[in-house]
Design a protein with these regions (language model features):
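Active-site helix of classical SDR
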Residues: 37, 73
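Substrate-binding pocket helix/loop in short-chain dehydrogenase/reductase
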Residues: 13-14, 18-26
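Active-site loop immediately N-terminal to the catalytic Tyr-X3-Lys motif
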Residues: 15, 64-68
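Active-site-adjacent segment of SDR/Rossmann-fold oxidoreductases
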Residues: 62, 83-94
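C-terminal helical subdomain
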Residues: 97, 117-156
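Conserved NAD(P)H cofactor-binding loop of Rossmann-fold oxidoreductase domains
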Residues: 5-10
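Residue(s) in the substrate-gating loop at a strand-loop-helix junction
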Residues: 57
Length: 179
């Protein structure tokens, strides 16, 4: 199993982003995960039952204002995960991701996004590690077919609501959370 994790965040309106900050975020969050997956493939392909786990974010459920580029980069990770899970099946490689909400890591230091203020930082690194473990050690056939994995009950509830709701309802809920 390879844990493919790369992420930085910039905050504020896109039009106010410092020169180079968007390029840096995309180089890390998008290119880092993509190139990490590509580099891991030959090793995974030689390992029966291999798995690639990408670290995404609950920000991939609906675009988040004030952290729009970060959110978009995590949408990319979710899409890459889905595509590679299909593409690499022929090589017996399962590809999944984990979507935590705000977790108690250095990534959130100094972040003032409304979604962070409204939801708080309740997820611990240990909870994320447990979600990673559970994602790569599925206990049922249903769980083995699952691609996206939440961490907390709230992550999972938000994902389910987004999956079952029309876009307008999901957008209203995202606005309520993120302002």
């Amino acid at each position: 199993m390879v844990d493919n994790n790369a992420g930085v965040i910039i905050e504020g309106p896109l039009q106010d982003a410092e020169e180079g900050s968007v390029d840096k975020l995309l180089a890390i969050n998008v290119n880092g995960v993509t190139l990490g997956a590509r580099a891991a493939h030959p090793y995974l392909a030689r390992t029966p039952g291999a798995q690639l786990l990408n670290m995404s974010s609950a920000s991939a459920e609906y675009g988040q204002p004030q952290i729009a580029v970060y959110s978009a980069s995590k949408f990319y990770v979710a899409g890459l995960t889905e595509a590679l899970n299909l593409e690499w099946r022929k090589d017996d490689i399962r590809v999944v991701d984990v979507w935590p909400l705000w977790a108690k890591t250095d990534l959130v230091n100094g972040v003032k996004a409304k979604s962070l203020k409204r939801l708080g930082v309740r997820i611990t690194p240990e909870q994320v590690a447990q979600a990673v473990w559970d994602a790569v050690h599925p206990k049922s056939r249903w769980a083995k077919g699952k691609v996206h994995h939440g961490v907390s009950k709230l992550d999972k509830a938000l994902y389910l609501m987004k999956s079952l709701s029309p876009d307008r309802v999901a957008m209203c809920f995202a606005r309520l959370i993120a302002g």
